Amino acid sequence: GWILKPFQHLVSNFGIPNYAEVDPTVLFSLSYILMFGMMFGDIGHGIVIATGSLLLAKKYRSFSIVGFLLGLSSVSFGFVYGSLFGYENIIQPLWMSPMHDPTLVLLVALGWGALFLIISNLLAIRNYLTVGLKQQAFYSGKGIAGLLFYLAALFAAYQLMVNKQFGLLEIIYLLAPLSFIMRFQWKQSTAGLFERILVVFIETLELIISTVSSTLSFLRVAAFSLNHIALAAAVFSIASMMDMTGHWVTVVLGNIFIIVLEGAIVAIQCLRLEYYEGFSRFFSGKGKAFKPLKLDI
């Protein structure tokens, strides 16, 4: 539809889905809009972005649709955070405030990242099964074994951080799927014995590291929501040193600076998370765009 078309252009920048792959446009558009709001939650700033996008609708239709939806997401999370043009004490937050509940914001960001990675893993499994790669679907790091390992890692982290325990049960949960992945890697390699051992070791280590690093990458979702408040606080701090006129000029210019500069940075960071933490797991982007046959008569 016309709403998804602008997001399709952003997906195409990474690549075109082939015949067997899930078209990620719907997932991309929903998660991109959601993440932008989480990272740039402010009622006033969101209204400015949405209004500005509407004013540009005639000249930049695709851009205006994306901008308007991002603005609405920012407004929505602005109510969640209780933030209005950087002021955190005008309205009550509906749920959490990055200023007063930074730990909760960090945990929510990690939870969102885990959900995002699980969905990406499920799509990778679906793509493997579609083309008949059952071994990869069940036993690879991006298959069911990889998903079970990730779930086991989440469980182990929860047990360690919340219940302060990490015992035999957690070790078994981690090693069981990992053993299937290592066995699959061993069978896939055609190198000599020593090289095969080295390949399996390196690939397993890479899987473990990427499991942790990919999840922690989503901490930037929380980091930018905290950064948003810090920038606003800096603006208000400078404004407080001036007379009435200087105060409001500084506040207005500071908010414009935040909307333009931080808004652009957040949009790019969201794109990075989509491409490198999402698409790289299930989307090859090696398809070819459909071009209808044209006959010259």
Regions found by a protein language model. Name each.
Residues 1-297:
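Conserved, carboxylate-rich catalytic/transport cores that coordinate ions
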